[in-house]
Structure formats: C-alpha cells, structure tokens
Amino acid sequence: MTQETKTASSKPLWIPEAPLDTNTHKFKDFVNAKRGLHLETYEELYAWSVTDIESFWADCWAYTGTKASANYTHVLESGKTMDNVPKWFSGAALNYTENVLGGMENNQQPALYSLGE
C-alpha cells in the first residue's frame, strides 16, 4: 500500500449531519444503559464489541428488535474459535423476511421493486 493510498483511505467518505441521531450513537447509549458502561466513542464501542462478543451480539439482537418464534439459548457456541465456525444464536428460529421488512405492516408502499430487460 502506498502512502497516497493510506492517506486517501483514511479520510471519511461521509460524516453524518446529526451524529447524535445515528443508530451507532443510539446503540452505544443503549449498551451503556443496559450494561452500566460508560462508552464514549466509536473506538470504545468497537473495543468492547470485540472483547465481549456475546454481550455485543445479544445487545444487537435486542436493540434491533429481532423477532423470533423461538428465542436463542446461547449467543455463541462456547469453546470454539472463529476459525472453527461456532454456532450463533443456538435454538433461535426466525423468519428473515419478517425481520427485514418488519415495520412495513401498515405501509401501502411497495417493499420491493424488480426490473428486467
């Protein structure tokens, strides 16, 4: 990687107009309130997410309001490393479409568009 590439890639592509209204900021506040933490920056949130992986993903599940017909018993299969591909959210049963299109129940707008030649 050249110095020019390093410099170009370190510049943000986008900065939100209202950083306190971003989902990342709201998620950080959610985690702080739920866990009694005092994460202030994105870097602190990231560091916590990679050191307490199970709590991070459990909080992602809760924050996003993931709907499931059967809840998970374990977030992450214990005793396995990422290179051995552990099982995630064991016991959970969910409908992907329900979660992706959730909140559109009362919307009269199309959820998907399709174009063909």
Task: State each model region's role.
Residues I53, L94, M104-N106:
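Short, solvent-exposed loop/edge-beta patches enriched in aromatic
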Residues G79-D83, G91, N107-S114:
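Active-site-proximal, glycine-rich beta->alpha crossover segments in alpha/beta enzymes
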Residues S90-V100:
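Short amphipathic alpha-helices and their capping loops
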